[in-house]
Amino acid sequence: MAKKITGYVKLQVPAGAANPSPPIGPALGQRGLNIMEFCKAFNAKTAQIEKGTPIPVIITAYQDRSFTFEMKQPPVSFFLKKAAGMKIGKKPASGSKTPGKGAPAGRISEAQIREIAEKKMPDLNCDSVDSAVAMIRGSARAMGLEITG
């Protein structure tokens, strides 16, 4: 018989930097899950990923207090900032204050957008790469990025 699922926890955790402090500790503690077990497993799985990359993770909690977790690709905004050469660090660079008006926050090429769309394709809710490209283009414009050739 399959284990009974008691809930899901969605978090965005920096690669290789999971620790029991908020937001991870309280989110898992409420479900009665072993926080350190998750932190060790997550850090081991993300060891090969660039440290600090935000990784969306969905944790499935079971009635017997065990869990499984599934990692997704980093957010589109992370890929766009990286491709546009915007600062990514403790305090992430924000997009333009008024997208479409004034100076752009950065520049990104169509080729870079297609590459991001192909990477994110499994996580996006679309059928073709072209529709994924359109979604990424919209995100880039909303961030105040200028799309070139």
UniProtKB/Swiss-Prot annotation:
Function: Forms part of the ribosomal stalk which helps the ribosome interact with GTP-bound translation factors.
Subunit structure: Part of the ribosomal stalk of the 50S ribosomal subunit. Interacts with L10 and the large rRNA to form the base of the stalk. L10 forms an elongated spine to which L12 dimers bind in a sequential fashion forming a multimeric L10(L12)X complex.
Domain of life: Bacteria
Keyword Ribonucleoprotein attributed: yes
Protein name, per record: Large ribosomal subunit protein uL11
PANTHER family reported for this sequence: 60S RIBOSOMAL PROTEIN L12, LARGE RIBOSOMAL SUBUNIT PROTEIN UL11M
Keywords: Methylation, Ribonucleoprotein, Ribosomal protein, RNA-binding, rRNA-binding
Pfam families, per database record: Ribosomal_L11, Ribosomal_L11_N
Coiled-coil ranges per UniProt: none
InterPro entries in alphabetical order: Ribosomal_uL11, Ribosomal_uL11_bac-typ, Ribosomal_uL11_C, Ribosomal_uL11_C_sf, Ribosomal_uL11_N, Ribosomal_uL11_N_sf
Post-translational modification, as annotated: One or more lysine residues are methylated.
Similarity comment: Belongs to the universal ribosomal protein uL11 family.
SUPFAM superfamilies given in the database record: Ribosomal L11/L12e N-terminal domain (SSF54747), Ribosomal protein L11, C-terminal domain (SSF46906)
An annotated Gene Ontology molecular function: large ribosomal subunit rRNA binding
Gene Ontology biological process terms, A to Z: translation
GO terms under cellular component: cytosolic large ribosomal subunit
